[in-house]
């Protein structure tokens, strides 16, 4: 997983969702940024985002919650994940137990669930996912093409007249 903002710094800075919490029982007052991370494995089609919730009060470096969210149908994740996976867990949203959480994670998950009620926000996540995936796959295709070209050039050099050895008859 890689932050969207690393591949698209200007757009990521402009479009990262943030919320200011005031007088809530379940969260300290202040700003919460919902940083998007997407899969950077070539060819992956998981259609999911991982959200790291960060705060300026902790230098935007401490992760307050990690939330996984997929916007496709359960049937999509059932097919995508195969027999050993739980499509409900893959779809989410849910606190990602393999990544950092705090005692505020459940409250931040509830806040995220409120945010994704906005079709505009979900569409933004989907658009960012598409941009990110196209960028990853383009980069991968370029690296494969470069490797093929290097291999072909090596073959040509090895077959060239200076490298060819004549065998006595």
Question: Where are the regions that the model predicts?
Answer:
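N-terminal secretory-pathway/extracellular module detecting exported/lumenal segments
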Residues: 1-41, 144-161
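Eukaryotic low-complexity, non-globular regulatory regions
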Residues: 2-8, 45-46, 73-86, 154-169
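Proline-rich intrinsically disordered, low-complexity coils
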Residues: 3, 9, 28, 42, ...
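Generic preference for flexible, low-structure residues
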Residues: 21-24, 48-50, 80-85, 128, ...
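An exposed acidic His-Trp-rich patch
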Residues: 50, 57-130
